Structures are given as structure tokens and as C-alpha cells.
């Protein structure tokens, strides 16, 4: 960890306004200036900042440069960005995006995060690739997501916004989880958190029903949605509203009850919805070609009761990954030079993927 990273990590718990923080970093010589990076093109927008593809003029390395969006009302850095920086400074794993350093803006009015660059994100790949991922490739992707998530959860962090557009992939087939703007550290006792997190299509039923008790299980529900999306080549539960999202879940998994989900009826919003009576689990009908091991894994991820839902460790032990077709090696994942060049073009599209509209 660089001197700059150590200093930032130590001081971010303080209530710095951003000009004060940026000036302090620059004047003390602890962080580099953004002038040392050549912005090549804008490649996207995270939860709390704009992301550029850039070149480090000192090393010629291509990086992702994320400009932290300012809080105009408070003339400072949003608490969400502070959380993202402090969390990423703690995390070092091959399947989690790397925060290399923090640099300051041209006029000391802003800060930028220098991240490891990944050539593509899974959402845009799924929309544009001519041939869908094979099942062996899907397994390769999911294993990497699960390894990163196991590390994250063992570090007592919940991502809270897992979706295909937040999964990046390098040209060497390495999948990395990104965008930690909504992530939270958790502990015992579990502190209340807002249920208005996680993109709608990937949101766990307990969140839709208003729980403020959030655990790693909300990430695991999202993993189930991601696996299903990779297998089906389209989003599994593309709800247009919260009530529509709940209805889609019930159509797929059946109506929840106290028998299968103790405490369900006491959730804050449980009494506000009139759930259809649907007694069947339709996962097998949705994926008739999927093996029994694959269906068991999906069902384990889609358990209504968060306490019974699969953990990342449970999933990594699944027999689904030990049966044919076996997961391919990351190095054997397909590359997408046409898509990469499209992203790298100066006129690259800046709009969000259709897969992450909610």
C-alpha cells in the first residue's frame, strides 16, 4: 500500500470537505495529480461517479479513472464515496476490482480513484455477443464471482448491488466485481439498513418486503439471478415495479408462507401486498435442460428464508461445478476485440445498458 493510500485510509473517517482533503493530499506530496493521467475516453458511470479509460503517463499503464461525484449541497465528498474508498483500500483479491491509488483534481477541487482496467462488462457483452456463453464458460464466470464474494463476506462486507453490469472481465478471462458505492460493512449485532438497495431485478424478496435486517444473503439472491441470466441469456426477473417484481418471484418460486419462511408475515410490507396463490416451483420448467445439480444450486440460491439461503462457500462446494461440462479455465474464455474497440472509441456510448435500467 502506497504512502498516499495509508494516509487516505487513516483520514477518511474524518469529516473532510473535499477541497480540504484534496489540497491536503497534494500539498503534502502524498498523492499524485490527475494531470499525470491522459483521459482516453469515457467508458461508463458507476453508482457514485463517472469512469474514464486513461493512461498513466509515468508508466504507460491503461487504467480506469473514476471521478468521484461531489455533494454540491455540502461542498464535499458523499459519504457513499467515502465508504467505497475505505472498503476498496481494505480489499485485495483477484476477483475484486483493484483500487490502485487516489489522485487529486487539477484545481484541488476533486479526487479520482485509479482502478485496474477491465476491457468489458458482462451486461454489454450479453447484449452484443453473437454467440451466448457456453455452460462451461458460465461456470467459469460464476466460480470467479463466488470466490470474490466469499472473500468479501469473510471480510464482513455486503456488496448490496450485484448485477451483471457490475461484473467486469479482462481479456484474460478474469472476472472482477466492481462498483462498491452501496456496499456496507456489517457485524454483530446487525444494524438496520435501508431496504431500497440492489437493482430491482436482482433484489431479494426480504428487501422487497421491507426488511431492514440485511445480511450476505441478499448478495446470494443476486448471484442466483446472475446465474439464471447467464444460463438463459436474458434477465430472469425483469420487474417494472416492486409489486411486479414480487409477483414475478411468486410466479417462479411459488407463494411464500410461514412454513417455508418463518417470520415472513411479520415483515414491514408483507401485509400491503396481496400475493397470488401459486403452489409450484417452476425453476425446472424454466430450465428444462439444466442438470439436477444445477437446479439444486439455483434452488439453494433462491430460498425464500434468508437464513437457509446458500452462502458463497456452499456454492463453491456445489457438485454443479464438478460435473460435465466442467468450468473452462479463465485463459480459455473468449475475447471480444470488436466490443473492446467499440468501448475504446472516443464516441463510445455513455448510456447505461438496457439490462440495468431499474
Swiss-Prot record:
Residues annotated with Phosphothreonine modification: 194
Catalysed conversion reaction: L-seryl-[protein] + ATP = O-phospho-L-seryl-[protein] + ADP + H(+); L-threonyl-[protein] + ATP = O-phospho-L-threonyl-[protein] + ADP + H(+)
First-listed, main subcellular location of the protein, grouped into a coarse class: cytoplasm
Protein kinase domain ranges (all copies): 37-321
UniProt EC number: 2.7.11.22
BP-aspect Gene Ontology terms: cell projection organization; negative regulation of cilium assembly; peptidyl-threonine phosphorylation; positive regulation of MAPK cascade; regulation of actin cytoskeleton organization; regulation of cell cycle; regulation of mitotic cell cycle
Keyword list, A-Z: ATP-binding, Cell projection, Cilium biogenesis/degradation, Cytoplasm, Cytoskeleton, Kinase, Nucleotide-binding, Phosphoprotein, Serine/threonine-protein kinase, Transferase
UniProt subcellular location: Cytoplasm, Cytoskeleton, Cilium basal body
Region (Disordered): 332-358
Pfam families xref list: Pkinase
Keyword Phosphoprotein recorded: yes
Function: Cyclin-dependent kinase that phosphorylates the transcription factor ETS2 (in vitro) and positively controls its proteasomal degradation (in cells). Involved in the regulation of actin cytoskeleton organization through the phosphorylation of actin dynamics regulators such as PKN2. Is a negative regulator of ciliogenesis through phosphorylation of PKN2 and promotion of RhoA signaling.
Name of the protein in question: Cyclin-dependent kinase 10
Gene of this entry: Cdk10
